[in-house]
């Protein structure tokens, strides 16, 4: 399951919407130097994911509007995409 690195994704020519989204996440990682600032530490990233899952759970259990729930879901999706980039796993 060899995936692309941040550099690979930044220089890659996307062929579909998924690859466009992956490239945007990689560009964000590159811009903020995640690899150099411990942003690819998976322990840290998993803790962020747990936090985001808690926010989604709270939005759902409190009956928040669907757009707020969707925002929390998007946060989790973006984090998971970033996990795959940090771990160089092809989704």
Task: Please report, for each region that a protein language model flagged, where it lies by residue.
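Flexible "arm" and connector segments at domain edges
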Residues: 1-91
């Amino acid at each position: 399951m060899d995936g692309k690195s941040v550099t690979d994704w930044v220089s890659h020519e996307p062929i579909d919407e998924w690859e466009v989204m992956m490239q945007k996440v990689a560009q964000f990682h590159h811009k903020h130097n995640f690899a150099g600032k411990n942003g690819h530490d998976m322990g840290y990233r998993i803790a962020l994911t747990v936090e985001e899952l808690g926010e989604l759970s709270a939005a759902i259990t409190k009956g928040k509007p669907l757009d707020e729930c969707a925002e929390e879901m998007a946060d989790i999706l973006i984090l998971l995409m970033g996990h795959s980039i940090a771990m160089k796993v092809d989704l």
